[in-house]
């Protein structure tokens, strides 16, 4: 199995992966596995119990959303599954909006960001009135 629109593998946790969680939340949701290499092989994590506590709190505090964090085991190696549901409202990471596209995380900027926010808030450009010319 390869990384795809809804699956990302990381060998260990870094706080920057909150951007990936943000991207999944703004797209169709997905799962991040901590303790798996780029080939999808379980390599395990040594601090699984700490991650089970830290990750949900960091996601809540930084992104304002809730994700499921589960401890899994394969061949005696523990790894973490972070299950991110899609959110209908735009989710940002420190003022930046990320989006999962294919097997990549994209930061939305400019016209793409405007379009994304308008779509998520149910608005259209033609309903905005310019008051001065």
Locate predicted features:
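Conserved N-terminal catalytic/coupling substructures associated with nucleotide/phosphate chemistry
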Residues: 1-133
């Amino acid at each position: 199995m390869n990384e795809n629109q809804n699956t990302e593998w990381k060998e260990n946790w870094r706080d920057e992966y909150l951007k990936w969680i943000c991207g999944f939340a703004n797209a169709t949701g997905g799962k991040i596995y901590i303790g798996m290499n780029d080939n999808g092989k379980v390599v395990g994590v040594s601090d699984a119990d700490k991650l089970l506590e830290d990750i949900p709190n960091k996601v809540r505090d930084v992104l304002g959303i809730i994700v499921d964090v589960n401890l899994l085991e394969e061949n005696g190696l523990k790894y973490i599954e972070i299950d991110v549901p899609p959110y209908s409202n735009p989710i940002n990471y420190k003022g930046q909006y990320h989006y999962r596209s294919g097997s990549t995380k994209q930061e939305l900027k400019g016209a793409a960001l405007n379009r994304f926010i308008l779509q998520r808030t149910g608005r259209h450009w033609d309903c905005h009135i310019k008051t001065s010319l």
